[in-house]
Amino acid sequence: FHSIEKLIENNIFERLILYKNTINKDWIIIKKEDKTFYDKIEDYCNYSLEDICTSFQGIITGCDKAFVIDKDDEKINLIDDRFLKSWVKNKEIQKYTIKDNRYKLIYSNDIKNESDNPIIINDFIGKYKERLLNRRECKKKLRLWYELQWGREKAIFERKKIMYPYKSFENRFAIDENNSFSSADVYSFYINKEYEEIFSYEYLVGLLNSEVYNKYFKINAKKISKNAYDYYPNKVMKIKIFKDSNYTHIEDLSKQVLQRLKNGESNISDLEYKINNLIRGSLGI
């Protein structure tokens, strides 16, 4: 093609028309039918995740080899259990549930005196001392050499919460009830105290893992490859949430999904279908 005009005339591109009166501070360039779908959800819902939940990122160790160990490692039995935390990685998060993880985190920030914990210091973390000392926070004297780079507050992990990967092909939101810690490529959120009697974790994952909410999120998500999307909290926590007469039904079906998965059953399509229909009915889509 010798000109843009000729290229456009050839009709090999999809055309989108934007009207000034529909443009707000957040530009969303989408098909008309997708905008109708998106707007129905935005207009119907009275809450967003950021209204009812607190979000946080996983831990940055600064050197995974020093702090993350396989549960099958023979030496793990030598470590005091109070320093070992369940460690969840991105790939272990599925819809609704988390796969059995293979790893444990040594939460070394709880070590008050390195001489009191010679096994952890000498047999595990100490092997990487030189590398750990080169971390920016250690050079600035903000961290002891054996501490995690960004260990966060333990309390935010040691509670019921919803975890999700920061990159995914689809919505994957899982309930964690095992006080799991996670790597930095996993984000989590928990329901704020004032909303604990209004929303349940089971209801939220029922919505978020549905076909409707998968489509809804992707309309405004950043696409990073042919099929993968960013799931950063700046977009995830803006997801709109509703509560209406279908709340109990959706919550109950979601609990049934969780029970089946915990029992080792993989076929949940019938329950997902029912959840999706209830959501569509509520939203009028």
Residue ranges with predicted function:
Residues 23, 27, 37-55, 243-285:
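Non-catalytic DNA-recognition/assembly elements of restriction-modification systems
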